Amino acid sequence: MNIPAYVITIKDDPLSNECADKLIMSRAGNFEHEITKFDAIIPERVISLMTLHNLKWNYPMSEPVLDMQTGMWKHPYKTAVTEKRIACFLSHYLLWQQCAKTRDGMFIFEHDAIFINKVEVGLLNQSKCDIIGLNDPRGATRRAMQYHTAVQNSKHAIVGVPKIDTDQIPQGLPGNSAYFIKPAGAVKLLRLVNEYGAWPNDAIMCKQLMPGKLGVLRQYATKVQGVASTTTL
């Protein structure tokens, strides 16, 4: 059984391709499925794609906003160019659309991920979670040590996303640069975007909107390479 796996890569960016190649090389002995480069959406395509898919960006860029539908605070991300943040969302969104049509799910990576341990696909398939993060939170998310400690204190191989903040703050995977997503998870995300509008992918994919459906590997399979973000610059 070959499960689709994609690494989101900026086509004409040397650093992005170099990092993606490192990820692909690191799969030896850790990941049995072929990883294909997926051309990242670039800012110049944002308007046309948002229009094509009838999407509306519904996330603040400068000041925090209380979302009345969900009761959660939406805090702006550090982003110099708004279209880069939306383009990042669109790259994941288009892969969610593909995943929703698959039978066995999909692995989605950003170019800054790299393998550090073997991925046990059977374990992922057997989990009740629809989306499972592969990443070590350290260096990949806010309150990383709190997140890491909560995961490591569990006895389970796949741990539910821990609570590291108030319920009014979206909380999800430890960085969205490496995760396994089942068709049911993709369908749910597409519905959430339709209902609440387009948010950053790691905000809409939160435990508050997907209760009981998000998990994290206790033995992390990937970590971030520690390169500069292409979204915040």
Question: Which stretches of residues belong to each language-model region?
Answer:
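An acidic/histidine-cluster motif and surrounding catalytic segment
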Residues: 1-109, 113-233
